[in-house]
């Protein structure tokens, strides 16, 4: 089992965990939840032996095999399938030993190694690796492509598959759905439900957590609180605990007030001084109960749009694509106030293309898009985070939209999105991805849109912010079109589901459970097609055409690959600078008055590295998205 005992973890002068205690039994599947920045990822880093505890202890069996998702993937020439198989380290070691034994012609060693390979089911490893990759959205053709051919999002899927193929005793997953579409999320959920080891899962997706985990550890107020059951059960139990805590707090406050009243009345009287003194000591010894805080720190709503024209947007026989490649054909869509549409479809089918088309970021190849007079778009996509001005604060961004408004009104509004105190005037270059996403949403909400277009709006958002966004969208009066892998948000905010598939956009007759069945049926059909003989598959001309297309795609994507490689080197350098600064800041002696100048320099190095790293990461993300889109188009040709 894993035991955390009186654990203390600091980051510089900030305490993340203090005297925290928790236990995880073998085979348990634990959801690790809490606000962004509370220490969830730091706790996983502790288990991975990447950091040390500042106090207390933690233990788990030394024989346990750990697996986690690597965050970096070099541009390797190695085939995707072989890269994933590398995740089974014991298999690779035995494979190397077998090669050496064959070279020596050592029959005894060969027999022994074959026995070990049999014991770990080595002969099925290629099919197991292929199955993992298929589940995560890779085609048969992609299995043999080099890792360097894939964009960042797809490389993260390769890293995830590499972690899953490891025959681990303890699997650590930190937001594994961030780079996945809904199809892959559904597949991963099924895989994790059948996982036999111990799982610690960080996720802000309640629908993903619920069917998987049987325990929740909630990091709050520098402590770890344990709850048996899934996330929905945790919410009920926590509400009960907080209600009890509040009742105890109020009861204690009454007792404190009574004692204080006695002390104030009789302290000066000689006949009662002794009794008053005893009550003073009683107050001093009393362990005060904190009041319960259950409020969501985020609170906002969409103000009523200035107008609600009907229809807001109309499409007639619209086709869309990139260059000569048609992604969507003959789209017919009518959006009116109150339309609430969730887009479903496999990766690369064209969901984001449709959103861009609706937003006016992509011109139609043919057909007409009719926009109502008075339409006001609110468009959210991940690349918009880069449009924030790095040298400006949240209040400066908002003031440009509302130059006539009083500063206090702007501050009050931003407070609903979690920007309070100094955060309101802090430059966005220092912001995390979640903070930037919240600011972009705040700017959208302020403008009172009547048509909302949201492409994966919950990426980077924690559970509290997701809930606040969901509640605001439920009350939104205009039209909504959303792409999301967050099924709770889709269920709560949409009335109709549309399927983007085979160049078409059509109403889907069913719910999200029916969509899972549809995915399964399509996968079976494709597997049958793959197994069927194809007359031209091995023809010389087909191979020649395929090589030509691959060469053209490599040439087209080469500038982006070079830029991505440059950014990765820069991020590596900045990460090293940041690690160096944070290591120094972890030294308590650095905070002595005599080392004030050194501390200031160290803090400046930390801030500069964080700022540069954030800018590089956003540029890297944009380049990766462009590369991913080009590769998806190339694969479909």
Swiss-Prot record:
One Pfam family it belongs to: ABC_tran
Region (Disordered): 523-559
Keyword annotations of the record: ATP-binding, Nucleotide-binding, Repeat
Record's keyword annotation contains Acetylation: no
Effect annotated for changing residue 175 to Q: Causes growth defect at 37 degrees Celsius, 7-fold decrease in translation
GO molecular function list: ATP binding; ATP hydrolysis activity
Binding positions for ATP 1 per the UniProt entry: 34-41
Top-level taxonomic group: Bacteria
Record-annotated ABC transporter domain positions: 2-246, 313-527
Record has Transmembrane helix as a keyword: no
Impact upon substituting residue 456 to Q: Causes growth defect at 37 degrees Celsius, 7-fold decrease in translation
Residue stretches of biased makeup (Basic and acidic residues): 542-553
Binding residues annotated for ATP 2, in chain numbering: 345-352
InterPro entries: AAA+_ATPase (IPR003593), ABC_tran_Xtn (IPR032781), ABC_transporter-like_ATP-bd (IPR003439), ABC_transporter-like_CS (IPR017871), ABCF_EF3_subfamily (IPR050611), P-loop_NTPase (IPR027417)
NCBIfam families assigned to the protein according to its UniProt record, in alphabetical order: PRK10636.1 (NF007921)
Family statement: Belongs to the ABC transporter superfamily. ABCF family. YheS subfamily.
Chain's role: Genetic data indicate it may be involved in ribosome assembly or function.
Identification of the protein by name: Probable ATP-binding protein YheS
Organism field: Escherichia coli (strain K12)
